[in-house]
């Protein structure tokens, strides 16, 4: 199994979102061991993974298997989002990715899953995160679906 970790300067939040969608399609089987878990159980598992921010000015995005099992790697909102989007893809659960910010600038990502015909906030970034709730009142808020990011494929 390849250990793929993207490390680069931040270009844009759209590029980060694109990479989450790309890695979801490439590595969703990394979370096959979660197949028997309910969405709520997966939320709790991901929430309880220690948060570790990326180094300043560098964006790390690790494949889920490494985010889950290697404690020395950065594990921030985009890494936790990727674990959950991989689970959603594995289970056939529709998902989107939200980008938020406490002011007019984006700085946080999290998944939104369609459960029982309702879109549910699935932000498991921090230990105090609660399924279905924002971790802060966003000023900046934008939702992406994979089809929104086709320009990065050209």
Regions found by a protein language model. Give the residues of each.
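A structural boundary/capping signal
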Residues: 1-154
């Amino acid at each position: 199994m390849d250990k793929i970790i993207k490390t680069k300067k931040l270009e844009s939040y759209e590029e980060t979102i694109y990479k989450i969608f790309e890695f979801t399609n490439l590595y969703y089987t990394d979370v096959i061991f979660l197949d028997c878990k309910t969405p709520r159980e997966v939320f709790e598992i991901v929430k309880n993974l220690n948060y570790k921010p990326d180094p300043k000015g560098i964006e790390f995005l690790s494949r889920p298997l490494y985010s889950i099992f290697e404690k020395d790697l950065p594990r921030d909102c985009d890494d936790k989002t990727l674990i959950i989007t991989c689970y959603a893809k594995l289970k056939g659960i529709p998902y989107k990715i939200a980008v938020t910010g406490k002011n007019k600038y984006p700085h946080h990502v999290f998944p939104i899953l369609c459960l029982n015909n309702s879109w549910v906030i699935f932000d498991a970034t921090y230990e105090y995160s609660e399924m279905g709730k924002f971790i802060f009142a966003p000023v900046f808020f934008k939702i992406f679906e994979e089809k929104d990011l086709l320009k990065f494929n050209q």
